[in-house]
């Protein structure tokens, strides 16, 4: 159903723009609309809130760019979509069937990035990160109770009952003591605190880049992948690596 919705949205956009076929821009836009909701450009946002949202999304996107295991940023925007004040769109460069502990740790830091950025650079915290905190808590709990990625060791906690035909969890049977429940909560909190510390360290080290991102977001409202990579220095790093690789290959040929 989701795939059909994506194609339908892309087809509608293509027709509106006088195109006979669905092209990549329409497909990307339809993905954003279906996943995040329609743009709400008409929503009036104060200058103060706009700045907070810019720091929030700047925090998410910059941490995603700086941590090696996080998904690359495709787009960052402070235009409202659905219930969100702004959004950072990230996606893996290839299909993944397996996810590592390091991936989850970096993604936790990305999720905490909006909250940390608000706290560090606006001297306040808002209700904006509520969904991020919920997702971070779910991810950390899954690491502890489902994937054995914590100090409690390689085991699972809790038996889940599922509706087989719908693939949906309906309940969870508790197969551990209250003492273990406290240990699980403690591990979840530890993972989130460490992710918060990683986010804070990254933003402190890259403060100048964050300020550039915020300035660009306030001026343009949306930054696409190519411009984002230039702002944070990813493109330069990639080009330098390519130059070194070509140089090494050239030297090898001379030998």
Model-derived segments and spans:
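Short secondary-structure boundary segments
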Residues: 12-29, 88-97, 101-103
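Short pre-active-site segment immediately N-terminal to the catalytic Zn-binding motif
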Residues: 41-52
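Generic anion/oxyanion-binding catalytic loop in active/binding sites
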Residues: 16, 47, 125
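AAA+ ATPase "lid" subdomain C-terminal helix
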Residues: 1-25, 32-40, 61-73, 143-150, ...
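Soluble catalytic regions of large protease machineries
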Residues: 51-55, 61-255
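Short, conserved phosphate-binding/catalytic loop or strand-edge motifs used
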Residues: 28-33, 82-84
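Noncatalytic linker/hinge segments flanking ATPase motor cores
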Residues: 1-3, 45-46, 116-121
């Amino acid at each position: 159903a989701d795939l059909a919705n994506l194609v339908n949205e892309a087809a509608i956009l293509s027709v509106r723009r006088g195109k006979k076929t669905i092209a990549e821009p329409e497909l990307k836009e339809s993905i954003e609309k279906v996943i995040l909701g329609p743009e709400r450009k008409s929503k009036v946002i104060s200058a103060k809130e706009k700045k907070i949202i810019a720091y929030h999304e700047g925090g998410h996107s910059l941490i995603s760019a700086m941590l090696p295991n996080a998904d690359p940023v495709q787009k960052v925007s402070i235009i409202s979509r659905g219930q969100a004040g702004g959004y950072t769109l990230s996606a893996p460069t290839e299909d993944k069937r397996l996810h590592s502990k390091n991936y989850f740790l970096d993604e936790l830091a990305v999720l905490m990035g909006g909250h940390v950025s608000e706290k560090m650079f606006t001297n306040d915290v808002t209700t904006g990160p509520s969904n991020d905190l919920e997702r971070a808590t779910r991810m950390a709990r899954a690491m502890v109770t489902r994937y054995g990625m914590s100090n409690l060791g390689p085991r699972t906690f809790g038996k889940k009952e599922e509706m087989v035909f719908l693939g949906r969890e309906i309940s969870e049977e508790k197969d551990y003591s209250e003492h273990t429940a406290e240990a699980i909560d403690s591990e979840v909190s530890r993972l989130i605190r460490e992710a918060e510390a990683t986010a804070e360290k990254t933003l402190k080290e890259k403060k100048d880049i964050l300020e550039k991102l915020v300035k660009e977001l306030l001026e343009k409202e949306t930054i696409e992948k190519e411009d984002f990579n230039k702002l944070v220095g990813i493109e330069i790093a990639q080009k330098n690596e390519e130059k070194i690789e070509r140089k090494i290959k050239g030297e090898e040929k001379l030998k």
